A protein has these predicted regions:
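Positively charged n-region of N-terminal signal peptides that target proteins for export
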Residues: 1-4, 108-110
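Short, basic/polar N-terminal leader/transit segment immediately after the initiator methionine
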Residues: 2-5, 22-24
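Sec-dependent N-terminal signal peptides
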Residues: 4-16
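Subset of outer-membrane beta-barrel
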Residues: 21-300
Length: 300
């Protein structure tokens, strides 16, 4: 029984990830596609610097908390680069990571581009043993656990853009590396591959209003699949609001402001899954500052 309880505790980060994914992601990903696709590095006419924060399942002790800082820019008309650092904490476990990305784009026709991107990743997993309480204080399983573990990985993506639309595919955690913090076979975990498909279309109603529906599909090799539908409306390129539906998981209203050089957004995940009994929802903030020139294509 003792081992079973410990296994559950140690695996909280990973087992909740089968629902919320091992790779934490934002509900407002549509504002910066580089957050989920390395091939989007350099896809806009600006250099967006994106700062994000998300608190998942508010009111639930030890619930996940996620921070990230990223930036990407084009080098020329065919090449782009990007970088991202993030921290993800769940209970007594934490995951710190960094990505370096390179993208190469091929122009197709007058307004279309097809880009391929690759990012090298480095993750550091940590356990705070002082927060672990056991029925038997002499249990050596925790004593011999690894405090920190560094795991390399990689991500690959493709990204096709047109005048008012985009489609992308990402394969994350390509290597599927093992993560064995407790140095025991029965608690060993693995970084499973994640597959993302995302697409959207921006429709200009008139000079003041535009609507952008989008779709994000996520598939994890462990067997979990998730679909997310979003509709975002913008008024005079100043204020925006939207709503997402994550299948069998959450409804997500969101809103914010978007000026020439910056964007601010807030999203609230209203939990629909069994976690709603314990959770008071999830809060998310995102801030984007755009360096360099600004063009209408930057929104894509």
């Amino acid at each position: 029984m003792k081992r079973y309880i410990l296994a559950v505790l140690v695996s909280v980060f990973f087992l909740t990830s089968l629902q919320a994914q091992q790779i934490a992601s934002y509900s407002q990903y549509m504002h910066d596609h580089y957050l989920i696709n390395p091939a989007a590095a350099g896809a806009t006419e600006t250099m967006p610097i994106t700062l994000g924060y998300k608190k998942v399942w508010t009111g639930f002790q030890g619930s996940p908390e996620f921070y990230s800082l990223s930036g990407n820019t084009k080098i020329n008309e065919t090449m782009g680069v990007g970088a991202k650092v993030f921290s993800y904490k769940t209970g007594y476990e934490s995951k710190f990571g960094m990505d370096l990305s390179y993208a190469y784009a091929i122009k197709i026709g007058e307004a279309n581009k097809l880009a391929f991107g690759l990012s090298a990743s480095l993750y550091q997993f940590s356990i705070d043993k002082s927060q672990i309480s056991l029925e038997d204080p002499n249990d050596n399983t925790v004593m011999y656990a690894t405090d920190k573990l560094i795991v390399p990985d990689a991500n690959f993506g493709t990204y096709f853009t047109g005048k008012n639309y985009y489609v992308g595919i990402t394969v994350a955690q390509l290597f599927g590396r093992k993560v064995n913090m407790m140095n025991t076979d029965y608690l060993e975990q693995r970084q499973v591959r994640h597959y993302y498909f995302h697409g959207g279309y921006k429709y200009e109603i008139n000079e003041d209003y535009s609507v952008e529906p989008s779709l994000l599909l996520k598939f994890i090799e462990a067997g979990e699949m998730q679909a997310e539908l979003n509709v975002k409306g913008t008024f005079k390129n100043i204020a925006w609001a939207g709503i997402s539906y994550r299948l069998n998981d959450a409804v997500i209203p969101m809103f914010g402001i978007e000026m020439e050089k910056f964007l601010f957004g807030y999203a609230y995940d209203i939990t629909l899954s069994d976690m709603k009994t314990y959770s008071q929802g999830s809060h998310e903030l995102i801030f984007i500052y755009k360096l360099g020139s600004v063009s209408s294509a930057a929104s894509l």
